[in-house]
Regions:
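Short, basic-rich loop-to-helix N-cap that marks the start of a DNA-contacting helix
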Residues: 40-53
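Helix-turn-helix DNA-binding elements, focusing on the entry/boundary residues of the two helices
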Residues: 11, 22, 30, 45-48
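Short, charged recognition helix plus adjacent turn
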Residues: 64-98
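Short alpha-helical DNA-recognition segment
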Residues: 16-38
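A short, Lys/Arg-rich alpha-helix, primarily the initiator
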Residues: 1-17
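Alpha-helix N-cap/N′ positions at the starts of helices
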Residues: 6, 28-31, 43
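The DNA-recognition helices of helix-turn-helix-type DNA-binding domains
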Residues: 32, 40, 66-70
Length: 98
């Protein structure tokens, strides 16, 4: 499955989990949301963040789901381990300070 379709499934499932209609989401038109959920459009990062937060889920949860669709449970666990490890490594090389 393509990442675009995984993201589409994740957005649709998260919205349904929260019991929100496409019209009720209020951040984009129903037509645009439908195209996203069918995998016909890909949102910008900012729009993806806005939609996920309007649904009430963290954007990384939807993105993680998009990568995990179709994996076996142990593969999903391993994916989580890899992500945590890579984040730790990236943090070590982030030279900017807040």
């Amino acid at each position: 499955m393509s990442l675009r379709l995984g993201l589409a499934r994740g957005l649709r499932a998260a919205r349904r989990m929260r019991g929100i209609s496409q019209d009720g989401l209020g951040v984009s038109s129903r037509t645009y949301l439908s195209a996203l959920e069918l995998g016909k459009q890909t949102p910008t990062l900012d729009k993806f963040d806005e939609i996920a937060r309007a649904i009430g889920v963290h954007p990384l949860s939807v993105l993680y789901y998009a990568y995990a669709v179709g994996l076996k449970p142990q593969e999903v666990t391993e994916l989580g381990r890899i992500v945590r490890s890579e984040i730790s490594g990236i943090e070590q090389y982030d030279i900017t300070s807040d």
